[in-house]
């Protein structure tokens, strides 16, 4: 009896000094309800006006106490005011259980985590108490079945909370009167069976088993604050249901309305372009971190352009990672292009893992995959499995990321190239394999070759007469070229020789110099335009590398010098041979095709070696790193001293490359190109506008005044097909709906186990009343009730978490739409827009207030929770049950609390 006496003593202390309140037992002393009101007034005098209460008003007193405790403290009404009036001796176990919740609340925390105050609707408060009194309606009706007929009070989320806490309160059948009352008040409104104290749940005047209180539509157990009443008496439904989630509790869906988009992780990781498109359509404004490798973001429709097919593309294919070398979409990809992203530190790479078949574009025949171990006739270092940097003129590059429209620089480049060449000069594979150029990639036979060759000869002769500028000093004309051409590892030693690394220069048809300027090629410009800044720079550099003969080294310059008397073709072959000997085998073998630039540019090119050796003021020489894994990973790094280009011996070849007229300089570096820090950054107007608008939006003051507030999904100018996720989901404490559901299901299982134990323990308690074993059983009962409270507390915290996350996402959506409306001048706003703006403001304020309420409630709970462990320990010590400590380890009991705290 020590446990009961200890609780009784606590009640006596709390009620001391209150008139008409005398705690001499745990039954009749509480019948008039004044004791309950006194305890509440002692701790919360603001909730009850005790001086206005009268001892004879039994029903009103009990009703007031039960209502206040439920609405403001979150303590479920386990007792019924009508039962207290009807029974001369109230059920002792019910009162003990109910009062123990008062004790726990004022010494620790609310059984249900203090959710009631936040979730309960104030207008329903008066009817809720009566609802809690299932016995009231039941008492009026002859049988449990009719008990359903009385009209239900307005839907209230709070009752759920009550049921979850501790349904314990039906008067036990101790006496005839008690039995009569308990029979009526302890019957489940769904199954019609007896409801034990530990199973009791009162909602809107009906008593239910906790396990019977399920959603009518999805049959999921209803959770605190996540259900509503229906037009049919005694039936409730979830506020929202999880989409096709059988095991998930419906309440979670309501908390995560944006779930279809929330699962953006799935949509953005999907490997199928079609799936990515579907996901994008489903949530156009969803916030998801743009995955660098997401094909969805690359779904910028590529405008088919005949010129694009002839554009020079850079294919870097590493034998170890062939799947990454696909820059061109497979024919089946439709408009979804693999996006080129700066996925690796080495540079830009094709980030479309889904485009498995994109290894080569249809326009590029077998020549594209060209793993040729054999070295060209030059006999340079064997290019065995060196990563192939194939600069292939094909639509692959353009197809990789086709911009919505040609940029000015790209269009001019295309025109210039078309002027000199009808088709690409060299097939991607010819450089290494030595096999003849493929029909699709080779220049239209002699016509284009001879035309370019003749033009170059004339230009070179004119340059020789004019003379070349000092070796270390790039002329203004050439200075422009280096900027467009990133400093390759080998300062484009004879551009003629190195670009064409094919076994025979004849196969190439034109020396790399003779080919149209690769940097200006439509493919490179189109790619760069569609890429992010980093990606565009790397792409532009890769194009420049192609022109320069990326794999060539300073040594090729010597061949160029002595080749002054020889034809360009011979000079090229000589330089090629030497370049192979000195330069990396893989680079030379693969980079030959890039050199397709206009003759004018090639004439400017001779000076590039010097320009590379001495970059423009403030610029450090750069080289193309030879190591890359898969898809074009081209990075510019400072040239090592030993790799700085040696000034080529003065010879006709160098003089021939003396500064060209300004017009040629314009050809090499179009005015439309933004040359910054040696990076070519052509951007399509559409993308520039989007990026600029995005930056402007970020600079705008946020409605909340939070400088770091992320843009809402509705306000972010997402690219076509781009999927983004809400910033809320990026928070380290964010719990996905699936994780919350998993934890709730785990709590559900543990609650079921506790209820089974509680049913057996209740039977033993009623059978052992007055025996010596009663005190020990009562301690066990208190512990069981407390464990249940802990589980319900975890459940309420999860619900808090879920609701808070939903409100935060909702706030972002409202904020984005509101910001757009407020950005519009008042004079231009329509009446409908003004109304919508006002409505959004009200919603915004309401959402913020709801979030604040949740935070305040949780803070209050934390303060109470800090004392709970010690208070419970003191209670056990007062009972003199030290032997129980080994059985009831506090570490075990409080482990759920420690687990639930991180979820906050």
From Swiss-Prot:
Segments for region (Mediates interaction with RAB13 and is required for transition from the closed to the opened conformation): 807-903
Coiled coil, from the record: 735-771
Region of interest: Necessary and sufficient for interaction with actinins: 261-388
GO terms, molecular function: actin filament binding; actinin binding; filamin binding; metal ion binding; small GTPase binding
Ranges annotated as biased composition (Basic and acidic residues): 593-622
Residues spanning the signal sequence: none
GO biological-process terms attached to the record: actin cytoskeleton organization; actin filament polymerization; bicellular tight junction assembly; endocytic recycling; endosome membrane tubulation; neuron projection development; positive regulation of protein targeting to mitochondrion; Rab protein signal transduction
Keywords: Cell junction, Cell membrane, Cell projection, Coiled coil, Cytoplasm, Cytoskeleton, Endosome, LIM domain, Membrane, Metal-binding, Phosphoprotein, Tight junction, Zinc
Coiled coil keyword on record: yes
Listed Pro residues bias regions: 143-153, 363-374, 647-661
Domain bMERB: 723-874
Modified residues (Phosphoserine): 110, 143, 153, 249, 294, 494, 504, 598, 649, 658, 660, 726
Region called Mediates targeting to the cell plasma membrane, residue ranges: 261-697
Positions of the Calponin-homology (CH) domain: 1-107
Chain intervals for the UniProt region annotation (Disordered): 117-178, 251-722
Gene3D superfamilies hit by this protein: Calponin-like domain, Cysteine Rich Protein
Region (Forms an intramolecular interaction with the C-terminal coiled coil domain keeping the protein in a closed conformation): 1-260
Record region (Forms an intramolecular interaction with the N-terminal Calponin-homology and LIM zinc-binding domains-containing region keeping the protein in a closed conformation): 698-807
Assembly with partners or alone: Interacts with RAB13 (GTP-bound form); competes with RAB8A and is involved in tight junctions assembly. Interacts with RAB8A; competes with RAB13 and is involved in E-cadherin endocytic recycling. Interacts with RAB8B. Interacts (preferentially in opened conformation) with ACTN1 and ACTN4; stimulated by RAB13 activation. Interacts (via calponin-homology (CH) domain) with the filamins FLNA, FLNB and FLNC (via actin-binding domain).
Protein name listed in UniProt: MICAL-like protein 2
